[in-house]
């Protein structure tokens, strides 16, 4: 990401799935595709398409670990964009934390092998 404009960020975050991905990563730090699919109740191809857009925008970074790809928010997000994401998280905090609790109950987060195998 060389330069993220406000209109680009708002277009990206206007999609409910992309916003959910960003807020979950803001809450948990890092998740694999299968965790995101489970958390957001979306198919792997749909989540992967959204992750690609987020990665191309520079909002996300990924790392491979074996056959899994883990995603996290980029530390290079402009400060103004990070503030917007943080405020969005504050507005959706209860919803995001409920999703996180559900993910933990399904034993996905932290042990992706249960879902990702």
From Swiss-Prot:
SMART domains: HTH_ARSR. Residues 33-52 bind DNA. InterPro entries: ArsR-like_HTH, ArsR_HTH, HTH_ArsR_DNA-bd_dom, HTH_MetalResp_TranReg, WH-like_DNA-bd_sf, WH_DNA-bd_sf. The keyword Transcription regulation applies. Keywords: Arsenical resistance, DNA-binding, Repressor, Transcription, Transcription regulation. The keyword Repressor applies. Residues 1-92 form the HTH arsR-type domain. It comes from the Bacteria. GO terms for biological process: DNA-templated transcription; regulation of DNA-templated transcription; response to arsenic-containing substance. One of its GO terms (molecular function) is DNA binding. Signal peptide: none annotated. Binds DNA as a homodimer. PANTHER family: ARSENICAL RESISTANCE OPERON REPRESSOR, TRANSCRIPTIONAL REGULATOR, ARSR FAMILY. Transcriptional repressor for the arsEFG operon. ArsE is a trans-acting regulatory protein which controls its own expression. The repressive effect of ArsE is alleviated by oxyions of +III oxidation state of arsenic, antimony, and bismuth, as well as arsenate (As(V)). This is Arsenical resistance operon repressor. It comes from Escherichia coli (strain K12).
């Amino acid at each position: 990401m060389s330069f993220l404009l406000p209109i680009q960020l708002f277009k990206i975050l206007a999609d409910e799935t992309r916003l959910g991905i960003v807020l979950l990563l803001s809450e948990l730090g890092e998740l694999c595709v299968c965790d995101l699919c489970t958390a957001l109740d979306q198919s792997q191809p749909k989540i992967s398409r959204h992750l690609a857009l987020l990665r191309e925008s520079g909002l996300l970074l990924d790392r491979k670990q074996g056959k899994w790809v883990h995603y996290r928010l980029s530390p290079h997000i402009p400060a103004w964009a990070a503030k917007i994401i943080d405020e969005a998280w504050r507005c959706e905090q209860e919803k995001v934390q409920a999703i996180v609790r559900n993910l933990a109950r399904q034993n996905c987060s932290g042990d992706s092998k249960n879902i990702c195998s």
